[in-house]
Each structure stands twice: as C-alpha cells, then as structure tokens.
Amino acid sequence: MDKINGLPDDLLVKILSYVPTDIAVSTSILSKRWEFLWMWLPNLDYTSRWCRKPGDVGLRDFIHKNLPLHRAPVIESLRFHSNSPDIKPEDIRRWIEIAVSRHVHDLDIDHFSENENIFLSSFFACKSLVTLKLRSVTLRDIPSMVCLPSLKTLLLDNVSFVEGKSLQELLSICPVLEDLSVYCDDYENTKELTIVVPSLLSLSLYIPDEWLLDGYWIDTPSLEYLKLEDWNSCDHLSLIKNMPKLREAYVDAKCFLPKSVIESITSVKHLTICSKDGYGDGFVFNQLEHLTLCVCRGDSPSLLGQLLKDSPNLRILEISVMEDHVDDVGISLDGWNQPSSVPECLLSSLQIFKWPQYLGRPEDRDIAVYILKNARHLKKTTILADRCERFVTQRRMIKELLQALPARIC
C-alpha cells in the first residue's frame, strides 16, 4: 500500500479508470487522500449493479449527490443502464445536462421512459458528442435548426419517435455521422423508415418479424459496410440506392430478398447472405471475392448455385449456419441441382473452400463433392463436422467425402 500511495494522483486516477466505476468508488474508504480520487475519473459507468436498496434508489441518490460535484473537467463517457421506476425521466434529463456541460464525448443510455422525453432541446446542439447509444428511450422535440456537429457513431435500439418525429429528422442533424445501427421495435409510431445520410460509412439495420412495415428507403452514397437483417414477413417496399463504395455486406432476409437489395450489393468484395429466395437473372458480382452462405433453410442450395454462376472472380467460399439460425436448420436441403456448366469461378479463381459446420445431410455431401471435383485451382479446404454431430460424425463425414471423390483429388 505504501508503494501505491507514493504514486502521483494522476497515475492513481489512470489506474482506477481500468476498474468498474463502483469498484473505483469503493476505494474512497482507504484513506483521506483516496476519498475523492475517483471523482477525477473521465469515464463513468452507472448500472443496476450499484443497488444497495430495493429498486435503484441507492444509485439515484448517489448520482444526484455526486455527479454535479464531479471534478473531471471533461466527462469522456457516461453510461447509464437501469429500468427501475424509481428513476424518473427528469433525473436522467438532469444527468445528461450535466454531462453535456462537461463536454461529454460518449453517451450510452438504456432506460424505459414510457413515452416521456429525457432530452432537452439544447442536447441536440452538443458540440462535443462523438458517440450516442440509446436503448428503450423516447425521442421528441428534435429541433431542426441545430446539429450534433461531432457525432460519428449512433446506435438506436427500441427507440420511439413520437409527436410526428422520425428517424430521418434525427439523422438530418448529424452532418458527419459515419456509423449507424438501428434495431426497430417501435411498431406503433413508425410505419416506414428513411435513412438518407451522405457521410455514412457503416449501416446496421434490423427489422423484426411482427412489424407492420410499409417500407424502407436508404440513400447512403459513401457507405462501405451494410448489415441488413430483414425478418419481416409482411410484404413491404424497399428502395436501396446510391452505394457505389460498398465493399462488404451482410444480408439476412428471412422471407423476402428485394431486388433493390441485390442491385445495391453487386459491387461488394465480401458478402455474407441468408435468404430463402433467389434473386432472378441479370446480376453479376464481378468484384466478389469472399462469399459466406448460410444453409439453414431448405432451399439455400438454389441461391448457392446462382451466386457461383454470377461471381466469376470468387476466391473464398464459406458455407455455414449463422449463429442465430441454428434452430432453423432443416433435416434436408432442397433445390440443389448441379449447374448445366461449371461456373467460371470454380474453373479459374476459387482457392479456399470452408465448411465449418458440416451437417452431413445428403445434399451437403453432394454440394461439397461437386465443389471439390470442379474447383481447378483449390489450394485449401477445411470441412468440420457440426459440433453436435446431429446428422453425421466427423469420422463418417471424412469417409463419405473420400469415397465420393476421384482418386486424383484424394
């Protein structure tokens, strides 16, 4: 302890910054010198783990008492996660106001506010804010004549827009936004989504099954990465355009694979995709080098055949099951018919073939054997039996594949 006490205060504060905030606060009982050291921490993390009384009353009282007196001139990050009814919207509103006055860089709020606003209009003019993460909150009173000039990362999870406000109104005051993640659960107030952000580089959009959605419109000319999880089973419009710089896409379309989605991703170099639908003729993925295809659904092989045919420069092929699709895996696959002619990528470019969750269904074997027989420039193949070995053991898988292959490959 004597050695630690010999360190300067700024170094002790740096050490405290590596432990959870509540642990840092607990060091205040060590000595008079340590009593207020934690109050110089630039990063504050308040969650329900602070509870020492029923509900979050202990946390509420602690923040009310100490946040206004916090000594750090800049609060680099403030994280608050709690759904306790003891903490009111006006409490959070006050804490956010203090953080803004201390030039907060990163703000992470998770609190169900029951359609009550937790943001003052002045918040939307915060010049220092770089990252904003909101969960289960309500947004209203979004002024149009101000902006968040430094905001680059925005995450919205189950955020409600009321009184006619919309996602696009928020996006329109974020002139340098680069990373946007939207997880939609606001069924009542949002029937359509519009995302028009000229500066955006990365977009993740999740659309749930139960939502009665009219459609979504996306215009992001600088986008380089797209993650689209469209699980909606209702017929809806989609318009995705103006993505000339897109290089990587993750598309999980549970029911429909809109034409505009395919049109927007033909320039990618890396594609991860799961869909029960094909996409029709007339599309070519000339730049696609790395394809990961999820085969959880029965008709996945037909999509594989299309993509092999339309990706003449494919170098890496990975067949797998997406992590959250394990429960959707069917007993059999349908729709695998060997192409009438061997795809160009198998003849000239495919070098790596991976199948990390090989299930051993008859169709799985047919696909694997077809690729191994016809890939003329294959350098590396990795096929691993499904960890649970639901359909085939590792030993049986190896035996079946070796028996099916010609001697020159074995």
UniProtKB/Swiss-Prot annotation:
This one is known as: FBD-associated F-box protein At5g38590
Residues covered by the FBD domain? 335-385
The record places domain F-box at: 1-47
Renumbered to this chain, the signal peptide range is: none
A cellular-component GO term for this protein: peroxisome
SUPFAM superfamilies membership: F-box domain, RNI-like
- Output the InterPro entries linked to this UniProt entry: F-box-like_dom_sf, F-box_AtFBL13-like, F-box_dom, FBD, FBL13/AtMIF1-like, LRR_dom_sf, LRR_FXL15/At3g58940/PEG3-like
- Disulphide connectivity of cysteines: none
Q: Which organism is it from?
A: Arabidopsis thaliana
Lineage, top-rank taxon, reads: Eukaryota
